[in-house]
Amino acid sequence: MPRRTPSSRRGRTTALLVAAAAVAVLGAGSLFGNVLGELRPEPAPASASPRLELDAALPLGGTAVAVRRLEGAVRVDPRDAGRLGELGLAYQLRWRETGDPSFLPLSERALRRALRARPRDAAATLGLGNLALIRHDFRGALALGREARRRAPFAGRPYGVVGDALIELGRYPQAFAEFDRMTAVKPSLASYARIAYARELTGDRRGATAAMNLALDAAGGVPEPTAWAHVELAKLALGDGLVDAAARHVRAALAIFPGYVLALEQQARVDAARGRLGAAVATARRAATAVPLPQFVALLGDLLDRQGRPVAAAHERATVAAIDRVLAANGLRVDLESAVFRADHRIRPAQTVRLARRARADRPSIYGDDALGWALARAGRCAEAEPWLDRALRLGTKDSTLYFHRGYAAGCAGDRRAMRAWYRRALEQSPVFSMRWAPVARKALA
């Protein structure tokens, strides 16, 4: 039976990597997120405090109707805390569906109204914690998650929100402990996914895949959670260079949830890895059109570059910058993701270094370390870059992009032998790790 907690890995590590989220991680939203659930108070068992059941999610794609229904309900009764809390979470799901950040202020208003109506409402508190994760306000998410945990100690999700925030803040042993407790309180897709991420960050990729398969089982065939788990398994497979395995998971995701944008993103990556650039561009464009988030538009730009269409690629890069501005105007902190993107394309290097420093201060994780080191290296400040990129590798994470960044800094500093060693390591981990940088590594080793 695969291990269910990351505790046994802690002896090797002092801290753990951040998602990005995911994520894009989106996730990120929450790092393991894309798993936002409907928060609903339940009757307390005889021996327990009131608890929250957070796994009964509104079906993705069906929330427009739910939003209209809930908006009507709160117009009839403006102090219905339960309906206000559900509305706040439905707005978050609409953000996931559409990429429209204007739903996030609406979510905040609904959840705060719920708390005014019922000041100790755990569901609304945790909804605000989820919102803080989406906005990358990790210190705020930590405080709200802890408050929700105090109010509903027998619910699993508050432990997840607290753990997600702690990971982004670089407090990994504490984050692991929260994930352990979450799994003990309520084994679920959400808890197994966090265990998978913890194992991935500590270099246990086989264990990560095993835990994500448990998450897939826990999804129970429900379309969106099942598709999401398949997408995460596809990402793990691509990170190991297993293109055929990734393709199988993408097909499974799209079979159960046709048009799922996260699966379309991975389908484009699979097509590119197989040399099918035309198909990859078409699929990436479909994802970027459906949900215009930076990760999808940036992928399309990279694919267009690979196709030899620099003008079209530049247009997509400009679109990413515009989307970042809209996200920031709606309260999302995208400094880290923006810094990595700008460093990739050498956009105003000195300004990018300042952005990366600010991002790392907000998110003192190893991905924060990597973003700052990469920005410094791309700005030609190689000696400054190397210590940060070493810190980014301190957990033993098997990540080709981290290896490539370290090699680039070594080459920039004049140590071509070390550069080649790091590039070789990146390609051995996954020869398809990046459409932009894998060819650079191969050329340097030729």
PLM region spans:
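N-terminal leader/linker segments that initiate helical-solenoid repeat arrays
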Residues: 4-117, 123, 143, 431-432, ...
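TPR-repeat structural position
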Residues: 63, 97, 104, 138, ...
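Short coil turns that delineate tetratricopeptide repeat
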Residues: 78, 119, 153, 186-187, ...
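Start-of-helix register in tetratricopeptide repeats
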Residues: 82, 89, 123, 157, ...
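Canonical tetratricopeptide repeat
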Residues: 86, 127, 161, 194-195, ...
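Residue-level recognition of tetratricopeptide repeat
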Residues: 89, 93-96, 130, 164, ...
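Register position in tetratricopeptide repeats
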Residues: 93, 100, 134, 168-169, ...
